[in-house]
Each structure stands twice: as C-alpha cells, then as structure tokens.
Amino acid sequence: MSTPAVFFDRDGTLMEEVHYCGDPAKVRVYAGVSAGLRRLREAGFRTFIVSNQAGIGRGLITEQQYRAVEAELTAQIGEGLIDASYFCPDMPGTPSTRRKPEPGMLFEAAAEFDVDMAASYMIGDKAIDVECGKRAGVKTIQVLTGYGAEQDCAADFRVKDVAEAIDTVLYRSRLPAPSTTSRKSNK
C-alpha cells in the first residue's frame, strides 16, 4: 500500500544555509527538526531529503564533502528519521530531469518507496522547491528560513519554519478528505 511522504529541501530548510557547505562543522540544524521528523514518522509519513548540489558540479565541493555534511546532518537529527536522501550535482542550465525545479528526485523516491504522491508534501525555502513540488503533484509548503523570506512564490502554504511546516502537514493529514460524491437536491 502506498504511503504519504514529506520531501524536504536541505539547505535553508532543515539546516542553516551555508553557501556550498562542504564542512560538517558548519552544519546547524534548525530547532524542532528532530522532534518534527519523529512526529511525521509516528503519523506514518516517509521522509526524504531532495537537494540541488551544484557546488559538486562546479568543483567547489567534492561528493565526499557532501556526504560528510549529510552524515553530520543525520547525526544531529537522529538516525532513522530520514528514509533516503537524494541530491543532484548538475549546474543550473544543464539539461537535467533531477535538478529542481524538475521533479526527478521526487519521482525516484516515489518509485523506490511506493509513495502516495497525492497525499504528500514538498517543503523548502526557495521558489524552485515549490515549483518542483507542484510539478510532482504534491502539496507545497514554503518556509521563511534560508532564502524563503526573499522569495515569494505560489506555495500552497507559507510558514515561519520547518517546525511550523510539519505542524501544517500533520494538521492537514487529519482533515477528512473532500467528498467526491454528488449530493441530490431535495427539490
């Protein structure tokens, strides 16, 4: 059976934005991330990271540095709270189905983990994160951390930070689904 998921951008969403972060010592996870991820897991959501990493393609950081930062992020938030992490090293302007705003990384995760995209969310700080979610057919939440305060976009929801975004997902997931049956009038 398909399960709902939450796809998270990494930099500026789960952790403080550090331009082309290649140093694990610079990883600063936002408050509420660990507890929020735990709550999502308890509610039955899969959780994924989807991150553009053009710094690799530009030669500014190595894949090994990226993985060291990812390992530090995992250590700070807690093991087992993220199902999988996907990244795209392609530079802007390079034809790519994986680089956000293209939804390739979301579709990869959906195929690998049998994700119910109609019940899923994309959370990120940038307009490209929101556009990626829309192209994938998931609900979108823009956080005002990272670049979020500078980029107004057509997200389904705009919230202060990832903790509030997770609260929004959990609240919305408890709402009854809209009825698809038509009602007869009593004329």
Show where each model-derived region lies:
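Short, conserved beta-strand edge motifs with alternating hydrophobic and charged residues
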Residues: 48-50, 85-88
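Metal-dependent phosphoesterase signature
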Residues: 11-31, 56-65, 77-80, 87-97
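Active-site neighborhood of HAD-like aspartate-dependent phosphohydrolases
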Residues: 1-48
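Asp-based, Mg2+/Mn2+-dependent phosphohydrolase catalytic module
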Residues: 2, 63-84, 91-122, 126-187
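Charged, well-structured alpha/beta interaction segments
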Residues: 46-53, 57-71
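Generic enzyme active-site microenvironment
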Residues: 7-9, 50, 123, 159
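Short glycine-rich loop/turn motifs that provide flexible caps or phosphate-binding loops at active sites
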Residues: 11, 54, 58, 123, ...
